[in-house]
């Protein structure tokens, strides 16, 4: 089994980082997204694992908490200020057809759907957006964006 890149991210632009704790990346993709948030001029604020959203786990039936990977505020290409919650996931965990017949993967897909439905509802109440970022968003032609 492969190991994921994990560690503490060193923020270069502390005025932009609004989280209460040192950002921790749990994959190289999260590291890439942190670097993007920290360095991109359009991103005005960002935080790692800063929001807690209650949801019901559809497998256990228990109420629990979902913590999306990122909160970001940025100016879009039209100059409009946007605020989003971001979850970084591999594409094969976001599309049911790509999950396959593996029971473990199917359970995670069902749980993720419940988390993301709760996140969309929470964001709608706050007037912000929820987005899932995959490798297609992070990388272009096999290179980091």
Give the location of each predicted region:
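Electrostatic, structured charged patches in enzyme active sites and in nucleic-acid/phosphate-binding
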Residues: 1-145
């Amino acid at each position: 089994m492969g190991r994921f890149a994990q560690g503490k991210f060193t923020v270069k632009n502390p005025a932009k980082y609004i989280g209460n704790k040192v950002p921790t990346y749990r994959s190289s993709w999260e590291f890439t997204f942190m670097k993007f948030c920290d360095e991109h001029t359009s991103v005005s604020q960002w935080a790692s694992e800063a929001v807690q959203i209650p949801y019901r786990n559809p497998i256990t039936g228990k109420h629990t908490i979902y913590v999306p990977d990122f909160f970001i505020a940025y100016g879009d290409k039209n100059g409009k200020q946007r605020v989003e919650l971001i979850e970084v996931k591999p594409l094969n965990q976001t599309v049911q057809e790509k999950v396959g017949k593996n029971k473990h993967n199917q359970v995670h897909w069902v749980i993720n759907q419940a988390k993301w439905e709760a996140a969309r509802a929470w964001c709608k109440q706050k007037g912000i957006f929820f987005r899932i970022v995959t490798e297609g968003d992070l990388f272009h032609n096999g290179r980091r964006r």
